[in-house]
A protein has these predicted regions:
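PRPP-associated nucleotide enzymes
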Residues: 1-121, 129-216
């Protein structure tokens, strides 16, 4: 089994990724979703944590061999960046969602030298907004952002297009398609549910996948 499927199975087993097409979740945006992702749970599950953090480190070594610093996104990416940086023997810092309103008013925490080659560690990619905000802050500070390593991506068209437009490369450990198929294989959902999850990924604002469920 490759790492993409190993991570998918691990996330499902600890319910960091939860599939519930029969009872959709409601996101803050109001979108009805058959999937919910909380990668913070990885930190509470030692076996899953070991798998994921080693996979992040291996991905950095393989995809971004010139990396000099890892930068986590606040707050969810911080712990993952810290553990992976420890495994790699690299410096680590993180990017706040906004500058502090006291002290040195830092947006970027940790030492960053202009020109350093940085890899951003993110837990989840949906529309790409938060990670692109972090990349922008790092670029403004003079960093050369090599790309992103994320634990999970929904693979939404908007997110893919926004990353491409900003010339930001993202490598995810696993994705919605893999999780959906692994979910069916492991008995979490049915084969019919896989199609509903993929329909959701294609157009999250179109709730016809829910109607398809009720008609099935």
């Amino acid at each position: 089994m490759d790492i993409k499927h190993e991570v998918a199975r691990s996330l499902l087993s600890i319910e960091a990724v939860f599939l519930r097409p029969q009872e959709p979740f409601t996101w803050a945006s109001g979108i009805k979703s058959p999937i919910y992702c909380d990668n913070r749970l990885i930190l509470t599950a030692p076996e899953a944590r070991d798998l994921v953090e080693r996979a992040i480190a291996e991905t950095v070594k393989r995809e971004y061999p010139q990396a000099q610093v890892l930068m986590g996104t606040a707050t969810a990416g911080i712990a993952h960046a810290a553990i992976a940086a420890h495994l790699l023997g690299l410096p680590m810092g993180y990017v706040r969602s906004s500058s502090k309103d006291h002290g040195r008013q830092n947006r970027i925490e940790g030492k960053l030298v202009p020109g350093q080659k940085v890899v951003v560690v993110e837990d989840l990619i949906s529309t790409g907004g938060s990670v692109l905000d972090a990349v922008d802050a790092l670029r403004e500070a003079g960093a050369e952002v090599l790309g992103v390593v994320s634990i999970f991506t929904y693979g939404m068209k908007r997110g893919v297009e926004r990353l491409a437009a900003a010339q930001v490369r993202n490598v995810s450990l696993t994705d919605l398609d893999t999780v959906a198929r692994m979910g069916a294989q492991e008995g979490y959902i049915t084969e019919a549910d896989v199609a509903r999850l993929l329909a959701f990924r294609e157009n999250p604002s179109d709730e016809s996948w829910i109607q398809a469920e009720s008609q099935a």
